[in-house]
Amino acid sequence: MSLEALDQLQEKVQKMLEANALLQMEIEEFKEKNIVLEEKINAISAQQKDLVDQNNELKQEKTVWQNRLNSLLGKMDDI
């Protein structure tokens, strides 16, 4: 191999190493963003669970109040 060919090969290898380093940095950034997104998903999932629980409690309270109201209306009809 000529010296010129070796220089070109060395330059290509250096460019590939630099590109590889940049890609590794991008991968690390994506991993960090992924962690943040997973934390947000977990927080939203917890909020959703709380809202579902609260909704179920409100539905139960509504049923209790409807039963009480129907009972009172039934007593009024008896009078």
Curated annotation (Swiss-Prot):
The keyword 4Fe-4S does not apply. The keyword Lipid metabolism does not apply. It holds the Pfam family ZapB. It is found in: Cytoplasm. GO terms for biological process: division septum assembly; FtsZ-dependent cytokinesis. Keywords: Cell cycle, Cell division, Coiled coil, Cytoplasm, Septation. Residues 1-78 form a coiled coil. GO terms for cellular component: cytoplasm. It comes from the Bacteria. InterPro entries: Cell_div_ZapB (IPR009252). Homodimer. The ends of the coiled-coil dimer bind to each other, forming polymers. Interacts with FtsZ. HAMAP family: ZapB. Non-essential, abundant cell division factor that is required for proper Z-ring formation. It is recruited early to the divisome by direct interaction with FtsZ, stimulating Z-ring assembly and thereby promoting cell division earlier in the cell cycle. Its recruitment to the Z-ring requires functional FtsA or ZipA. Belongs to the ZapB family. This is Cell division protein ZapB.
